[in-house]
Swiss-Prot record:
Its biological purpose: Endonuclease that is involved in the suppression of homologous recombination and thus may have a key role in the control of bacterial genetic diversity.
EC number: 3.1.-.-, 3.6.4.-
Protein name: Endonuclease MutS2
Classification via InterPro entries: DNA_mismatch_repair_MutS_C (IPR000432), DNA_mismatch_repair_MutS_core (IPR007696), DNA_mismatch_repair_MutS_sf (IPR036187), MSSS (IPR046893), MutS (IPR045076), MutS2 (IPR005747), P-loop_NTPase (IPR027417), Smr_dom (IPR002625)
Family note: Belongs to the DNA mismatch repair MutS family. MutS2 subfamily.
Gene3D superfamilies assigned to the protein according to its UniProt record, in alphabetical order: 3.30.1370.110, P-loop containing nucleotide triphosphate hydrolases
Ligand binding (ATP): G328, P329, N330, T331, G332, G333, K334, T335
PROSITE patterns named among the record's database cross-references: DNA_MISMATCH_REPAIR_2, SMR
Domain of life assignment: Bacteria
One annotated GO biological process: mismatch repair
Subunit note: Homodimer. Binds to stalled ribosomes, contacting rRNA.
Amino acid sequence: MNTKILKALEFDKVKKQFTHFLQSEQGQMELNDLLPMTNQEKIERSFAEIADVAQIFQEYASFGFGHSQDISESLRRLELGADLNTQELLAVKRILQMSAELKDFYDNLENVDLQILDCLFEKIETFPDLQGSLQAINDGGFIEDFASPELTKIRHHIHQNEQQIRQILQEMLKKQGDLLAENLIASRSGRSVLPVKNTYRHRIAGVIHDISASGNTVYIEPRAVVNLNEEMTQARADERHEMTRILHDLSDRLRSQTDIIGNNAWLLGHIDFVRGKYLYMRENQASLPSLTTDQTIRLLSVRHPLLSNPIANDLHFEHDTTAILITGPNTGGKTIMLKTLGITQLMAQSGLPILADEGSKVAVFKDIFADIGDEQSIEQSLSTFSSHMTHIVEILQKANKDSLVLFDELGAGTDPQEGAALAMSILEHLRLSDIKTMITTHYPELKAYGIETEFIENASMEFDMVTLSPTYHFMQGVPGRSNAFEIARRLGLSEIIVAEAENLTNTDSDVNKIIERLENQTIESRRRLDNIREVEQENLKFNRAVKKLYNEFSHAQDKELRKAKLKAQEIVDKALAESDFILKNLQDKAQLKPHEIIEAKGKLKKLVPEIELSKNKVLKKAKKKRAAKVGDDIIVSSYGQRGTLTKRFKDGRWEAQVGLIKMTLQESEFDLVKSDKAQASQKRQAHLVKRTSQKAPSARLDLRGKRYEEAMQELDEFIDQALLNNMAQVDIIHGIGTGVIRDGVTKYLRRNKQVKEFGYAPQNAGGSGATIVTFK
């Protein structure tokens, strides 16, 4: 895009409005280099980035990362083999810190769905090791003592020397204070000295380093501290040497990472730039327009960014409209409207938010040309008309159907009749070339051209006849009219003179009356539109408030859910720890009897939180139908085992005989079984009983085709069930295969103290593919 348009529309001034929203020098550099784009995808990407930042600010109001310097020159020096000074290292350190902070911020983002910035955040790399090394440089650019053991040692020595020198000189101040010009310790050439009166210079032995301008004071280094000062000088030299070595070491560590650090710096600057664009949009009630492919432009309540308190106007430049012709007297705001269209297009094509309401649309032009204002060339001694015409000729040679052309006062600066004719001819050429054009003119001849010519639309600026001043409201579809007669009347010109003038221009008067009616209709339409927009704004505010409340509620709900999950996890962790303890105790026992298994499983059951069933009306009603009594058959819910009630205690608990074991149970821990249909009832109720089998316990376990871990788990459960059901003997089919499961079964049975004996089945019953187990 040609650079003349940027100067004509003061694009650089617009860019400066974004400066105070930026925090990084890299972001400022990106703003300085910003130019309008002609690639629609790139423009839409810029808008999507701003929309991403808007999402972030909606959830996190404090999104920012502080000031940072441009480190590109420092990185270039590193690549050339140079070492950085402390200030340069401090700038790099800040970039690394900001990278880590921004990466951490991104990793903790919630409730946002980033479309573009996701990939930028993910490209940021962190360098914890380098950050740790650069802690040797503090925020003041000073190398810390802990930067190296040698530096620690040197500075400790310097500190001790300083204390000794100060102590000696303090003693001399006390004892020989009357010989001194001032009672203080001075410094000359890096050495501690005393300001001695010239008349007593021979009373203090030492080295003279300086004499005051008046000659009354001599600065003497007492002999008692000469050696210490020599040591101090050497220590300072050692310190400088060690600091140089440290800077070289730190620079070497950074040298291999310059590309990545440089990319990080660019990413930080770019994100800062996008953040700045969003902040500008928020502060100025700007918006992100949509892009059209047919050169349609619809600007709603558009304002010029460089004006204070600008008047908002609507501008509709439809795809089938070739030109908009703004007519009317000067000082009405025609040029401002022309510039507003131009600068809005430049901002949008630069990926910047525009000062217009949401729902606005802009086109994407390959080039924008403008001839605005008085551009007379003094050096070329050209007249105003010649200057304008030279520029217009250049524009007509370069413009095409992908261009936008803006002409201010086309044809001005020459004879009005000839100027109007030239303006119409130029406009006709642009129309036939299908080039989008907006022009301003005060020539009345062009109004008729705009009315009669297809694809040309008239427009004007509103004038308040009460205050006799322009309102700067844009009236599209209404040509401008002269207000000379009405103004003359209001200013007191004789009615006879005004009436005579109106009679002399009777035709024009009729046209002006038609235009006046159009103006009134346009003003009324705008008033109604303003009312509609007020309602829309109220609805928008309401929708935003509802969305904010929903987000707050959603966040609170998520917080409570996370809290509940953490609490549940604590309960589960505690239960697992206790279950491990119980199982460990079982494994440690030499003998494991059936009642011990039941007791252990009872303890494990208690780890599961109990559900309050006392208020369950269905269960209450069901239990009332039949009360438990001694002799009833039951099924123990915890184990799915059948037993018989033998005794009821006063506290409501029951004693039950389950196999060979007596158990004490609550009523909620068992279900009644009708004695005459116990087996059938057990099957019917099995689906209601926790861990209850759907069929009678089997005396045979088939492990063929199982994985080793799965087989061992099933074997353990099978042996438990067999012991609980008082089985004397069971069969385990493991097959021959690789022998892994068979060996596992053998090892398990050898460890189990309840197994009396075991061995392979007879040849006709499976042989070495099955094992028969007999319990004690």
